[in-house]
């Protein structure tokens, strides 16, 4: 699922080499922490958050087939 997420994100941004995804696994939960270049954050979020909502919907659909809950968080680069 991490590769699927990376594929989607890297095709949306201008700097795919700066996309980093950290996977934190719990018992029945997976949290993906997404870090992208500052100029690309707006592209990931999209107008009124529509793009990130669509990405999260896709992840939830894939995860539900495996009986896992999934969460996607956008981390700010400091």
From Swiss-Prot:
Keywords: Cytoplasm, RNA-binding. Its main location: cytoplasm. InterPro entries: KH_dom-like_a/b (IPR015946), KH_sf_prok-type (IPR009019), KhpA (IPR020627). The keyword Cytoplasm applies. The keyword Cytoplasm applies. It is found in: Cytoplasm. CDD domains: KH-II_YlqC-like. This is RNA-binding protein KhpA. It comes from Chlamydia caviae (strain ATCC VR-813 / DSM 19441 / 03DC25 / GPIC). The gene is khpA.
